[in-house]
Structure formats: C-alpha cells, structure tokens
Amino acid sequence: MNVFWFLPTHGDGHFLGTSQGARPVSLPYLKQVAQAADSLGYHGVLIPTGRSCEDSWVVASALAPLTERLRFLVAIRPGIVSPTVSARMAATLDRLSGGRLLINVVTGGDPDENRGDGIHLGHAERYEVTDEFLRVWRRVLQGEAVDFHGKHIHVENAKALYPPLQRPYPPLYFGGSSEAAHELAGEQVDVYLTWGEPLPAVAAKIADVRQRAARHGRTVKFGIRLHVIVRETAEEAWRAADRLIEHISDETIAAAQQSFARFDSEGQRRMAALHGGRRDRLEIQPNLWAGVGLVRGGAGTALVGDPRQVAERIGEYAELGIDSFIFSGYPHLEEAYRFAELVFPLLPEPYASLAGRGLTNLTGPFGEMIANDVLPARAGA
C-alpha cells in the first residue's frame, strides 16, 4: 500500500467556500506541507494542475531539493506541450530529484479552460491526442529516436539524450471514467486512478480496466483519490465535516454546480450525481461523504469517521485492488499530521511502524520529556 498526501497549490484553509480561515499559496507554506509529508513517511504528494493552481512542475522543482524521500506526482497535459519536450522535462526532473518523479496524465475536462490553453478539441479527440502523446513519450524516454505520424501528433527523429533515472520511465498515473479513458488506461498507463465513488462503482471500474489491460497482455495497478476527515471519535469527525461547509451559501453551491455542468468530464458528472447539489444527501455510503464536491471540482468525497472506521473503509477499497491512496484534508498541514498519527497505526506496513515515530525520529523519544528526565509512556503500554 502506498499512501500519498496532497499539496494545496490552489489555496488552503479551515473552511470551504469562504476566505475566513484561509491561507495564501506560498512557497514557505507548501514547503511546510511537503516536509511534513516527507518526515511522516507518506509515499508522495499529488500536485494538482490547471489554471486555478500554481504550476505543478515549477512547484515540484522547488520542493524536491527541500525533501529527501518524498515522491512528486506531477501532471502532464497532452496537447499543450509536445510529447518530446514533456519527455525531456520528465527525464530532467527525475534525475535531479533522485528518481522521485511520478507522472499524472491529465486530458482536461473543462472546455473553457482547454480553449484558453489553446485546445479546441472535444472529449473523444482529446483522448486520441493523449493516446498518441503517450506512444511518443514512452518511446522517447526508453531511448528511441521516434518517427510518428498520427492524426494529431507528427514528430520526426524525436529523442531525449539524457535518460530518466527510473527505467523505463517514471510511472504513469491516469484517471478517467469514460470508456475511452478505460481503454487508454488498459493499454498505456501503470496506475489507474479513480475518485472516491461508492464501493460497487469502484469495483466495476477496476474490473473493466483489468479486462481491457488483459486484452493487451498487461496488468495495471489501481489508486483512489479521497479527502479524509478523521477525529478521535466519529461524533467529532462528523462535526468537523459540518464545520468545513458551514460558510457555504446556497448561491455559492448553485454557482459551482453551474460551472461543473459545462465540463465534458464523465468523472465530474459522476461526482456531481453523488450529491445532486443538495446538502441533505451527503453521506452516500457508510463514512463516505460528498460534501466537498458541493463547491470543489475533481475529487469531491471524503472518508469521515474515527480512526477505526476510516481504516476499515480503506481496507474495503484495498480488497477491491486499490493499493495507492491519495488523501487530503483541510488545512493540509495539520491534517497530514492528524491522519498519520491516528490512522497510520491501523494500516499495513510500513505505515504501522512509522506511526508515533516518523522517519526522522526512529530511535529517540516521541513526545515531550516529563520532569526533565522521564520518557513519555507509549500509548497502549
């Protein structure tokens, strides 16, 4: 199992839908979140992409020298940058980070943003571009000089003279809920990602992608993207969930849902359908809450509960075949610690062993010394 955290390059705070309790995006703050995730033992961090975020490649380049083990899941956008240039960027960042780069392939689901970025293609055509892009990108990073003449991409003698540290290339992560996305995942990517839908829906996605991968003689791993609200008791967790959205007005929800309605993303449509823009139908399965999606695009669901409940729900997704979990919580600095302290002890290794110690304090006392010479008692001792 690989547990990731999230870098809030689009802003952070205690509440959704308001500037109250908000924090600006800054390098010092992102450094705090990244170094916390690094020292706590998270496998990596997802860096979001799009016009509402700081650029993910620049952020990863700034933070890689400030961390030691943390991996960075960074987006590539087929159609915006050529596959050859993108491959060289990936090779460089992978080398300079010591092999800590992971690639998130994003086709883009907002037609308005796509047009602003110079992409005037429909849903099906964007997946054609992504397919051709990855065919070139993968071969270039494997050291080939590539000639490719596709419907959308045409390159001659495309090459990267400096190889990536990870071979054959940094692992490819990719999410999408349409048939075209599943076919692409089955043929070309290493890890298929889904947003946090109910268990039956996730199981169906996994089965479909597995079947498509098998037809290509491949196997694919699976990951899920979720928010998390965990507290010592379930009652505290649900109160925290209510507080997270207490400042959101009905007008704000309506405006957000209207914006999401223009998307041609099947995944975004499925996220919106989980709550229907209503506050009174947010727990969509035990401990799975759709409140974040009232105003946030993309991942819109959270695991809510006490540590045992959250760990049990994680275990249920793991039983389906999920082995990469990408979590986030508001505010991201505090919640990175809270999740590690409360849930890591209940997860498989290496996380259970990291709990209560962290990667930077494996042998020393954990907690404040008592009366100048007494070690703090270990919980459960």
Swiss-Prot record:
Gene3D superfamilies in the cross-refs: Luciferase-like domain (3.20.20.30)
The organism's place on the tree of life at top rank: Bacteria
GO terms (BP aspect): alkanesulfonate catabolic process
Annotated CDD domains: Alkanesulfonate_monoxygenase
UniProt-recorded Gene Ontology molecular function terms: alkanesulfonate monooxygenase activity
Catalytic activity: an alkanesulfonate + FMNH2 + O2 = an aldehyde + FMN + sulfite + H2O + 2 H(+)
Keywords recorded for this protein, A-Z: Flavoprotein, FMN, Monooxygenase, Oxidoreductase
Pfam family, one: Bac_luciferase
Up-regulation conditions: Repressed by sulfate, cysteine, or thiocyanate.
EC number from the UniProt entry: 1.14.14.5
SUPFAM superfamilies hit by this protein: Bacterial luciferase-like
Primary enzyme class: oxidoreductase
Key word Flavoprotein present: yes
Entry annotated with the keyword Flavoprotein: yes
Misc: FMNH(2) which is absolutely required for this enzymatic reaction, is provided by MsuE.
Function per UniProt: Catalyzes the desulfonation of aliphatic sulfonates. Shows highest activity with methanesulfonate.
Family: Belongs to the SsuD family.
NCBIfam families: alk_sulf_monoox, PRK00719.1
The name this protein goes by in its record: Methanesulfonate monooxygenase
Species this chain originates from: Pseudomonas aeruginosa (strain ATCC 15692 / DSM 22644 / CIP 104116 / JCM 14847 / LMG 12228 / 1C / PRS 101 / PAO1)
